Amino acid sequence: MSTPAERLGRAARRSDRLKVKIEMLPTLKRNIPLTEPMNEEQIERMDDASLSILEEVGVEFHDPIALEQWKKAGANVKGERVRFDRGLIRELIASIPESITMHARDPEKSLEIGGNNSIFVPMTGAPFLTDLENNRLMPTLDDLANFHKLSHMLPAIHSSAHHIVEPMDHAISHRHLRITYSSMKHSDKTFMGMTSSGKNAEDVIEMCKILFGEKFIDSHAVVTGNINGNSPLVWDQTMLSALRVFS
């Protein structure tokens, strides 16, 4: 059994650790003009060609909820194929905000995303890692935690992301819970959530309610994720259900 002096010593050391504040660099403001690889005419031709594909070929949505939503929005829906008037597309694009504030557990590390802000985030999804002896290893949850801690400590990194490496020592059925908890626990910066299914996305939102409070996340952005379409021109129910949860 530890003595009172030992317990006080541990408490003092913990207090000292908590006093150390990890500063984060602000987002990089892009003040240099963008490189323009195409002239105005080429941009207009590409824009017209892409809108022609959406109008004439369309996109498949393997999701009944999405199909109903597109009908209500005014798109031409036949079966699972949706075709879009270019006026509708431009109207929807115009409704997207130029920037949003992504709130972190530490309010001082919240980020403005968009505008001329450049944000630096760890890569995600690595199936292997390499140790100092150049051995290729299967990542574990402990490895992921270490990467999240490094992301927290590095001033130039603005987010802990989510599965920087894939923790292969945990089953896929609950891996997303471990990944999200590690992101939340080991860094107070912004983080990403798992969108590998609608159910997984719901679990992430429930965890965000615990961390930030249900009322807060109703009106503030606290987590982001990414979804991917299938080639060519197909969206499936798995990705779209996750998108709806995060929206």
Provide a role label for each language-model segment:
Residues 138-247:
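Helix-rich catalytic cores of soluble enzyme domains
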